């Protein structure tokens, strides 16, 4: 019995227009902070499609520049950072869903899409991992900023965790600022109608539950009157070594019994691609 051909959406720009969505060939990734290094290492979005409270696309590497201007003692100071990230070093499909308020930075690393190493582009430090009871730990590793463990449990209730397992068990999930973002290493096939059906299902299940669950969240570490804010320690997870360095370490460990000259050569090749 032959397999039925998958339905294709055709031209992405026309597909977006037909559905009342906006198509942009390139754009910035979602939920970037004012940190210059975060901006220049985040990659660039290609084929961005956005609707009411959500967006989707593909993030790849490339050249990025970010700058910040401020005045000090009557002097204008401009800081500019430029980085050329190899295009193929970042390749992530994503769906980002707007939430009602800013939240602590939380990451769910899906175990299903990991190889020897995590598939996350920016791996949080292991000390920030929060272990959970039940089946959830079999599907995801949860990371929360130090001191925000109870906040993470407030967000990821058992019913939301069950939806995450059912609908996004093969995808990495991140809550950053006021966005819930799911990622797929290697990208989503945006020309496949099934991809858009899955996006709609994730929005109506995970997205809807996350919205109602986080609407009443308050960070009691911030000053009264700033209820929509998150304390400085909760805004971003602390990162581990960049992926390229982790790969180098893994390769070096695998060849630990080989002559030191071989290990040094491996490090030099990997380092040149960072």
Task: List where the protein language model places each region.
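N-terminal pre-transmembrane cytosolic regions of membrane proteins
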Residues: 1-3
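Charged, low-complexity intrinsically disordered regions
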Residues: 6-250, 271
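Canonical alpha-helical transmembrane segments of integral membrane proteins
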Residues: 252-264
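Juxtamembrane boundary at the C-terminal end of a transmembrane helix
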Residues: 261-274
